[in-house]
Amino acid sequence: MMTSSPPPNDLTTLQTLSEQELVKLDWQSLSCFSGELLELHAEGKLGNENFAKLPRKPILCIDQIELLDEHRIEATFQFPANQSEWPYDPAESLEMLFQDQLDQLVGFWGARKIKGIGRALSSGRCTLYQSLDFQPSKTLRFVLEKRKWMTSKEGGGTAVFNGKILDDADNLLLDTRNVIVGILNPTDIHDLRQRFGGKSGVAKPDVNEKISGLRIPVFDNDLGSVRSGDGKTISREATQSISPDLWPLRYHFRGDPVVPGNFGTHGMLALLKTSASEDFGLRNPVFKSMLKKSFSGMIFEDQKQIRFSLLNVVQNDEGDVVAKEARLFLENADGSKMIEDPIYTFKGLTVTEG
């Protein structure tokens, strides 16, 4: 029998409960979540073993959820005071890691309504206003407001939110419109695994492992640029090998390993930054914005490769470098396509001089 829930927004009470008490709570009825509750959810210990789970740290960068109700989500994360305690390389660009937290929060919201597995489907315009790189003790606030929730005849659902990342002085750091996450039937995910290479499984994280200096995977084979016949646009491709040893798969998600979609976005940005430097002369290209991204497939763990493809890359009047379109394809290890259509597409991916 479930115990009665603590009062809404009573993080103080939650933080006094033992693990044995926390696992007895009906997490789907709570309106706030301590860090320990989020970690238990990631491990499937809240009655969600066969359903949606949050990623484990270090992919999960949410310390607690202060508010989660029918219309709004508010959560926070604080960087550690010492760089040595931060698991990522301090020089790493992290805007896509933190945008991924918005997707995770929307999926978590939807999984309270339907017992399924959340997957990001798309998002609209995303704009970076200030750096999201490591800054000691800095606090980030994730604020999301619901636009709509739709259920399907098959039993799934789709949640749409607008999301922002703020600092503790309410300065806007990043905003994303129309974050869309679907809640899928677990059997559908199983079928996708069979079709797209998710049979190998991955090693469990070592609980005693000291994680440091992590880099988000980008690409391991830059195939270079091709200039159009009129010389006005550039296209560029690169590939990356996928195997069960790729580190993000150990943490995202337990029992359902998949490369985070926004890590693929990070790789596409890295290729655009390379083009901006080599093809257009930018000294320090950084992410500025994108108009839209869409996910129609997932990168599972079996040996394969992914292909990044930038199309119609130009420099605009402001000096920004823009990929009017970008696509990510799933390929077999020999370079033949697993499926003809791209599994990720991007519109208006833009970098600027940092």
PLM region spans:
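Non-catalytic linker/capping segments at the edges of enzyme domains
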Residues: 2-92, 112, 133, 147-158, ...
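Hydrophobic/aromatic beta-strand elements that line small-molecule binding cavities or substrate pockets
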Residues: 63, 163, 290-293, 325-327
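Active-site helix/loop of acyl-thioester processing domains in fatty-acid/polyketide metabolism
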Residues: 65, 90-118, 258-283
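4′-phosphopantetheine-dependent carrier domains
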Residues: 113, 119-132, 137-150, 164-166, ...
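OB-fold/S1-family single-stranded nucleic acid-binding modules
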Residues: 120-123, 157-158, 162, 321
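Hydrophobic, ordered structural segments
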Residues: 142, 159-179
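Solvent-exposed strand-loop boundary residues in beta-sheet-rich modules
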Residues: 169-171, 332-336
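A structural microfeature
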Residues: 173-177, 339-340, 344
